Amino acid sequence: DFSVEQLRADLHGLTPEEHGFTYLDVDREPSGRGRLSGWVLSAKDLCDVRGMPTTLGNTDRTYYPERSDAFIEALEKQGARIIGKSSTPELGLRVDTEPVGLPHPDNPLYPGCTPGGSSGGAAVQVARGLLRAAHASDGGGSIRVPAAACGVVGFKPAGKELGVQGFITRTVADNAFLHGHRMITPRARIGLLVEPLFCDANVD
């Protein structure tokens, strides 16, 4: 269950280091209805969401946009519910997630370690089971690195621009659906590999 009501319950007692949000508005409604109705997402804190502060990973840079980025607007028009902003390092320029003036999210798989970056807050939210999916962006690994670090699914779509918009999800099927492909029934998960298979092997 990834409803807003369940999210409220799951957030109870969690610290910002544990949930990876820089801002929350769980009462926010989507601007339309469509194929994404029922999906509850966060937006990476490099992207503008109307009515929410954008910090760009540094509280000294905070501003309040009058409108959302085009990608976020499109998600909301399709019925997605954007309920907050996910943590990112300043300007998304690092492969950790240590924003200036804000809490640093913790890796759910390896407490005390970085979740990777720059979409680290998004990966934390999905890996902890708070969200089914979270908006992310990738120029040089910013979706793929935190997804790998937190044991979730990250995909950088092909595009002409260096930085592209995408998602971190729990399953490949969810990622494909959010990118416009038909929904398929995910196969049962047999196991999750969290350690290298041959970590103790000798290297000649």
Over which residues does each language-model region extend?
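Short glycine/serine-rich loop segments
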Residues: 68-179
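Gly/Ser-rich, acidic/histidine-flanked active-site/gating loops
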Residues: 41, 47-50, 77, 180-204
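Short, well-ordered alpha-helical
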Residues: 1-64, 91-93, 198
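Short, conserved glycine- and acidic-residue-centered signature motifs
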Residues: 54, 64, 68, 118, ...
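Residue-level marker of alpha-helix boundaries and capping positions
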Residues: 62-63, 112-113, 201-203
